[in-house]
């Protein structure tokens, strides 16, 4: 009997560690399963979060682009002041010209600044990339008229006189005074007094009239 009890005790001592190891392994496996599930869920959440981040970034980029487009549209329509690097062109009549000094058959009025001169220079500034232009603080917009009646010049219906101060912001104006260009021709042939100054801080004021969109058309 004592021998049997001893054998049973030995067998029990051999079996108990196996049960303990199995229980520990089961706990480890369950913990690992919980961890794997939690990690998979975290990965899923991170992917969803990244989608939202990308969407927000895209929306911010789109909003920024639309804001820039709106600024350009407002500048073209003259709805706001525009300040930045630009140029100031000042034109004045040839004060030295007189009926007796001009070439025979020439017209003394050729030595004065006319609306065609203003139009030509404004167009050159536009072609150079200017985003905002004014003449004597009259903002140039798509519906602006520049005309002359006798010695009276009007811009946007307002009377303006010499010296004509044309301001422009934006663009590159390196070729404005090129040899053979319009400004060079006015200076050389008719002695029109013209100064061109580039400045880092030029302000073109907004249009101060009422914009009539009745005849406005979408550009093709």
Q: Across the structure, where does each feature detected by a protein language model lie?
A:
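Core subunits and conserved enzymes of cellular information-processing
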Residues: 1-220
């Amino acid at each position: 009997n004592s021998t049997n009890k001893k054998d049973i005790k030995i067998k029990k001592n051999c079996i108990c560690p196996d049960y303990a190891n199995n229980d520990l392994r089961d706990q480890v496996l369950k913990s690992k399963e919980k961890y794997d599930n939690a990690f998979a869920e975290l990965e899923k959440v991170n992917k969803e979060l990244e989608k939202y981040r990308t969407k927000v970034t895209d929306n911010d980029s789109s909003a920024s682009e639309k804001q820039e487009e709106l600024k350009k549209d407002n500048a073209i329509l003259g709805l706001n002041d525009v300040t930045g690097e630009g140029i100031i062109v000042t034109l004045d009549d040839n004060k030295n010209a007189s009926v007796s000094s001009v070439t025979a058959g020439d017209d003394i009025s050729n030595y004065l600044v006319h609306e065609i001169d203003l139009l030509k220079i404004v167009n050159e500034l536009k072609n150079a990339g200017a985003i905002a232009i004014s003449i004597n603080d009259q903002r140039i917009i798509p519906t602006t008229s520049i005309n002359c009646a006798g010695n009276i010049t009007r811009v946007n219906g307002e009377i303006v006189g010499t010296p004509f101060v044309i301001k422009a912001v934006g663009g590159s104006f390196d070729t404005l005074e090129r040899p053979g260009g319009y400004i060079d021709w006015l200076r050389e042939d008719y002695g029109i007094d013209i100064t061109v100054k580039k400045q880092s801080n030029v302000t073109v004021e907004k249009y101060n009239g009422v914009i009539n969109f009745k005849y406005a058309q979408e550009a093709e």
